[in-house]
Structure formats: C-alpha cells, structure tokens
Amino acid sequence: MNIIAIMGPHGVYYKDEPIKELERALQSLGFQIIWPQNSVDLLKFIEHNPRICGVIFDWDEYSLDLCSEINQLNEYLPLYAFINTNSTLDVSVHDMRMALWFFEYALGLAEDIATRIHQYTNEYLDNITPPFTKALFTYAKEGKYTFCTPGHMAGTAYQKSPPGCLFYDFFGGNTLKADVSISVTELGSLLDHTGPHLEAEEYIARTFGAEQSYMVTNGTSTSNKIVGMYAAPAGSTLLIDRNCHKSLAHLLMMSDVVPLWLKPTRNALGILGGIPKREFTRDSIARKVAETSQAQWPVHAVITNSTYDGLLYNTNWIKQMLDVPSIHFDSAWVPYTHFHPIYQGKSGMSGDRVPGKVIFETQSTHKMLAAFSQASLIHIKGEYDEETFNEAFMMHTSTSPSYPIVASIETAAAMLRGNPGKRLINRSVERALHFRKEVQRLREESDSWFFDIWQPEEVDEAECWPVTPGETWHGFTDADDDHMFLDPVKVTILTPGMDEQGNMSEEGIPAALVAKFLDERGVVVEKTGPYNLLFLFSIGIDKTRAMGLLRGLTEFKRAYDLNLRVKNMLPDLYAEDPDFYRNMRIQDLAQGIHKLSRQHDLPGLMLRAFEVLPEMIMTPHQAWQRQIKGEVETVALDQLPGRVSANMLLPYPPGVPLLMPGERITQQSRAVLDFLLMLCSIGQHYPGFETDIHGAKRNEDGVYQVRVLKHAC
C-alpha cells in the first residue's frame, strides 16, 4: 500500500513547483503517485482502490468539504492540506479528530515533508492492522532461527524437495513464515488467552458488539459443540431447532442430554421457514417436556439464525419470550448483521443484556466475510463461568492452532470497522438488490419464460423483507407477524414448474439441470432445491461475478429454448452414461424429471415429510453408545420402518436431519421414508442425478443402505 493521490496542478508557480518537488521526494521513498482530475475522480479512486494511503490537496480550493466526503469513505485515511500565509483555517475541535495534517507551500522542504508523510503513512497502516496480525507480521519479518514446530521451518523444508518446491511456489513465502508454533511466546496463546491473542479477542468483541469473543480455528461445527458442552450438562434437557446443522446433531450424540425439538415450517418449494412463535411459548415447551421421557425444563436453547435460505428472526422477541437461562443462536451464515442498519434486532448480539440470561452467537467468519476456511467466532453477552467455558473451549481446540487462520479472523473483523466496513456490507446488499431487479427486468421483457426470484413483488429499497401473514409470495401458510425477515443478500432463483403454493404446472425445468449447466461454465450454486437455486452475495461478489451469473441464466434459457442435445449442452452429464443420454435432448430430460416429481406429488410429500417427526425411542447419545458397542446392522433403506436408526439421515439439499439417531419411522411419519425413496428414484431413472444422503450409502447395485440398531424397538 504505497499510493498517494495528489490534487492538482493549480496553474500557479508557487503552488505547483513545491508539489512537483514533493512528488519526486515521495517517489524516491517508494510511493506511487496518481493525479485525479477533480474531487469526483478522487472519491471514485478512494472508493474503488483501498490501497490509496494518503491524499494531498490545496486547502483553499477544497477545504473541509473534501475532507468530510473522504471521511465518509475512510475516516482513517491520512489527509495532507497545503496552505499559504493567507489561508483561513476554519477548523473546529471536532474536525481536528480527522487524520488531517497541514503543510505550507515552500520550496526546498520536499524531503522533510515526504519523510513526515512516510511516517504518517506507517502510522496509518499500523492503526488499521489489528493487534495479533500486526504481531504475526512482525515475527515473520524477523526471520528467527527456530528449533521447534512446525517442521517445515518457515518453508525451508519444502525447498529441499521437488514436490515441496511446487508447494512453496504456490503458497508463497509469507504464508509459510506465518505458520508458526505456539512456542513463540511473543504471540501469546490462543488456549490461555494471553498476549496478542487476548488483544485480538477484545478487539473482535468490540467490533461485533459482544462482551466476550473467542476465536475458533476448526469451524463453527466446533464452535457449536463448545457452546453446547458448556451450556447443557449431562442429564439436562435442551430445546433445539430441528433445522439444526449436523454439528449440533453430533453434539447430541456426544452429550448425554435430552433434546426437545422446536419444529420449523417449510413451504411447498422446500424452502426452510423459521420456528413459528407458538413453539417458543411456555405452554408449548411444557407439552414437549410432558410428552418426552426423562425430559425436564430445558436449561438451554439452540436457534438457527438465519435459516439456510436466508430467513432471519426478530431475535429481540425470542430473547425476551423464551423461558430458558441460556440461548445459542447458530448464526454461521450471517456474520455481517452487526454492520448494516437493515439487520438491527435480527442478530444474537443485538440489543442490551437480557436479565437472567446469557446469549451465545456462533458465526462462520469464512462463509460470508474475508477469512480462511474453518475460521469461526463465538460471541457471548451475559454472565457465564469463564473458567469452565474455557475448559470446553480447550477440549475442542488443537494445541497447535493455525495462526494464519487466527490472523484471518481478526483481519475479517478489522475490515468491518468504521465507515469502510459499513460501505463493504452496504455494497454487498446493493449489489444483491441490483441483481434481483435485473432478473425481474429480464423476466418482464421475456416473450416466453424466464427465471423468477423468491421475494416480495416490490423490492425498491434495501431492507430485510418481512414474511407477513396473508401475503402469497413466500408460500408459508401460517406466518407470524414481525417474526421472520428475508435477507436481501441470500438470493433464491425460481425455475418454472412449481409455484410458491405447491401447484405444479404441466411442464417444468428442475433446478438441478440449471445448476449442472452453470457449474460447467464456472458458476457454482450454493444450494439446489427441486425448483430453486440459492446464491450468496457475500462481500467478495463483484459486478463481474454477478454479471457472469446473469449471463449464465440467459445462456441456459437460449440453449433450452433451442432444445439442444444433452451431449452438447451438458457434456459432463453426458459422460456419466453416454448410452443413456446419446440422443436425448434437454427438454426431454427436463420433462422426464418433472414428470417424476409430479407423479410423486413432490410438494405435498416434502411438506408431509417434515410435518410429523419420527418417534424418539432413545436419545441420540444413547443410540451412539449402542453403535460404538457394535450393536448395529445394515438394512436397505426401504426396510427402515419399525427399526431404530443408528445414524442421522439428511439429504442434500437442504442438509436438515429427517431422521436422528435413536428415532424410528412409524406409520404416522411414513412420509419421511417416502420422501427419501422418491429422491433415490430420480437418480435411478436418470444417471448423474443421484441424491447425496448423509447416513445412507449406495451399494454397487444402486440400493441405498442404512445402519439400524439391533434388538431395539
């Protein structure tokens, strides 16, 4: 970061000549100089080039107006105003809080001024670099000889082998120098929360509005287990979202606790709704306790916020209503909600403390922000036992944590601070909104069919759109007022074939075809439903990527309308079974899969599969204990009724458990099995469309098999 912007020239010698001298002096110190044509040009430069580290301008020409506009973009950026003896310095005490320095126009002072600018630039870079990352950068630059782990010794070992050299050249020297041992005392300890690691935790907590934050280097799957192991002791009961991530299902297998399921809604499209308000009432919880063996009043609750499809809760209502001492919001998909006003009141850390309750929020920093994979955070607000919690933290944390991941977590937080952070999130929201409008425009202009978007009819302004009772766009028949809200950056594209109420048309285009088409053109879909595709507009999505997706959708329509051969349109799919797809055209394939969905009454089957939960014969923990003792056997999927499942079964998409360990499918919950068998049948009819079902394995004959407990009824 070495770019200085200079506003000028001014057409007068006494101003232009000192600036020319300063330009030469700055270049000799390694700075790159750019010359914006005017203030509009400058502001565009700053907005789109974060590597600019200073602005030089004439005070008489631009004064505080320019400073204020720059501060809206980056309040930390150093500003250098040049004045003459007649300049009026109408600067208030508040204005002096800006990073603003004054210099006089004079010849012969260029080197001295350049030295000062170099100093202020270093201070700026030091100021925006968070504490642990700064310490890690410093250590990596020192190049100390170490006789401890890791064995690659800052990458030296890699350069002693041809494959190692390839690895070194790909990742680069700094990445490997930053991969250091916990033996480096000046970097402190992640496990003991000392030194720069402690400073990083405090820095992150301030940034995210938490009272305490913990950095986790092996994903939110682990963060969820840490919180659960602390909050729900053996023998206790907890409330848990049935839409939970499988890491929470694994927590139930690890901990001897009794789960009470909070049952969410779904619409006919298969989009996951939230947990309705009625599930949070004392009466509802009391009924669950009374109906569940060994259950007591719950000590802890786990809510998935947001849902996979981007629905956020009014978390302030939940925190006040839910009568449990400890609430965990699994917010893996929304680590950005603290940084834009449209998300106010929709995150775990929003608002003040709730008397008598502790609030936990886990976030996958890597999912939608700029952090390395497995980067995760735990935020806490409320009273808790810090020493006991840290035991749970250490229980699940490696004694050799990845310091590059730690630095990436902290840097992700640094990127969100101040006006630059707000602008970063706002740009993501605006880009998603623009994309939504473009799809709407193309749909309106199309003379036949085009894709639709799951959203209200009017989306003129950026907001979290409420899922309001009585409106038809969302497809939820029993929506609650002021409860669930659609996140604008989670964009769900709808394909023809089914509407939000589950009415299936004569013809349709299953979303899996579109996903395969896009994938072959370098566009990867986050989630594919029967007739919908989910795209995430994270802060890394730029205009080029958004336009690439739009182009991919229009190219699919063009190819589909031409009814191209599968061989030409989807060559990777064709390669799965050339004999089967040899003469097939894309419309024949689409209508074949669509016909299967209609025959099985897909929307009705999906709703029934999630309407009645299977019977819990034993807790997931008890079922796991039976499994590790070897008390399991394998049966075909269609033999599952009446047997107690040893594993969780969850199809992708959407990755939500249909059957938990210790549960049994009964006649009342038979739709669970019918739904799974329907998913399997599509892959049996059409090669390349096999369903991924966690907990079920497909043998060589194409039969899905599952594990059940022996002698359990």
Predicted regions, residues:
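Non-catalytic terminal extensions of PLP-dependent enzymes
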Residues: 13-30, 39-57, 64, 70-72, ...
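Short hydrophobic beta-strand segments
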Residues: 2-16, 238-241
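Long, structured ligand/cofactor-binding scaffold of large enzymes
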Residues: 163-254, 260
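A short, charged/proline- and glycine-enriched loop
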Residues: 1-4, 50, 211, 234-235, ...
